[in-house]
């Protein structure tokens, strides 16, 4: 109905607004017996949390998650897991000047037209603040996937504006505020963001997310293909305007002889498909990329209109991210984890007794 849930066997439902009392989510379908505490989720929440860098919004939220249900004596019970994060640093007065004004590039106009009203404070339900609960739920999925099945998920910023990562050093990702894997570009990123902030403008970014250890067989053709559900989940992240699986749009210029991921008993020779063939995981790493648009909440004046249809000028005040991609890495990881968790449980429900005599291939 209202689009607040994702998944079939591992179901995540979120609620709450940017300037409301709290954010929350319900997780249905988590298997019992998983050791789980708030600390298991807090690490990823801290990675997403606002106010941790001079290049993100100045809004300071501790984002401390509370487990309300579904955990007893430190383990999941198999019943619904209730999670809550209180909002503590709302400054709704920053938005009083746009109560009847539509910000171009935002959901103000479409929410008003769809619902006949809108919560103008920080974007309400359309704010990326809602993704805190996705990250919390994703952390539960990530722990189960790693602990029970050896599946690991990690993401990084592969491009910010014109600056692209030339090398991928996974050890660098958590060592800088950009989640950037190329240390040689950090100085350029820092300078670029300083100048951008001075100008009052914003910039887009590209985020890459990878899952390793994914078994063969996840995905439910034809309408619940694994790559289709991954794309659906990643496109549901605020500001995402494009998703690629594997080589993505790069396949347009590839020849069939170049992009077909040759096989031998020793394994696959390449992974242009991004770990999915025919909508089913191949056992290779799942590789996806997302493109995030620059936020429209900028201090550069722009033309818009009021709710009454009158012309108006917009100069956005408040605390905003000059590049929303900086905090998107843990969100992308969470969405991939939720999809993989859901498909793992679905596959187990239908196919746990299937035995194939064909060798399982890895990368050569």
UniProtKB/Swiss-Prot annotation:
Cofactor note text: Reduced FMN (FMNH(2)).
Key words, A-Z: Amino-acid biosynthesis, Aromatic amino acid biosynthesis, FAD, Flavoprotein, FMN, Lyase, NADP
Chain segments annotated as coiled-coil in the UniProt record: none
Superkingdom of source: Bacteria
Reaction(s) catalysed (UniProt annotation): 5-O-(1-carboxyvinyl)-3-phosphoshikimate = chorismate + phosphate
Positions of region (Disordered): 41-60
GO cellular component terms, semicolon-separated: cytosol
Keyword Amino-acid biosynthesis: yes
A biological process term (GO) from this entry: amino acid biosynthetic process
Record's keyword annotation contains NADP: yes
Annotated residues for binding of NADP(+): 48, 54
Known pathway: Metabolic intermediate biosynthesis; chorismate biosynthesis; chorismate from D-erythrose 4-phosphate and phosphoenolpyruvate: step 7/7
GO function terms (MF aspect): chorismate synthase activity; FMN binding
Top EC group: lyase
Cofactor: FMNH2
Residues given in the record as FMN binding sites: 125-127, 238-239, 278, 293-297, 319
Similarity field: Belongs to the chorismate synthase family.
Subunit structure: Homotetramer.
Matching NCBIfam families: aroC (TIGR00033), PRK05382.1 (NF003793)
Biological function: This reaction introduces a second double bond into the aromatic ring system.
Protein name: Chorismate synthase
Organism of provenance: Shewanella baltica (strain OS155 / ATCC BAA-1091)
